[in-house]
Amino acid sequence: MVDRVSATDATVSLINDLKEIHGPLLFHQSGGCCDGSAPMCFARGDFKVGSRDVFLGVINDQPFFMAEDQFSYWEHTHLIIDVVDGRGGMFSVEGPTGKRFLTRSRVFSDEEATFLSKHPARRAKDLDGIEGLKT
């Protein structure tokens, strides 16, 4: 199995803190104008995922999605979600913590790319079993 997204230890720790405050979360990586391409973190019930958004996987048991048009640029890379000092996105729940999520990446190896070509990413509309997910 090849993961499309992973989290650093610092990210896992911040997610744990945020879950205590906000409950179940979700992440969305967009190419939005306001917060650039920063990964945004939302309370799961507060954000409606687009039906064509791409499900990349989970980090610390929280689903991670990307806008379909962005995925066409990033599909050959493994995303590593990290945490750095700074102000989070305007609507992202980590904003008040003095930390922000940051996407790092690496290109998939040939072996990983071959595996993923046989296991395409799913769209949000095709998912079942993610409690509280709105599409």
Where do the PLM segments sit?
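Domain-level signature for proteins that mediate thiol-based redox and metal-cofactor handling
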Residues: 1-135
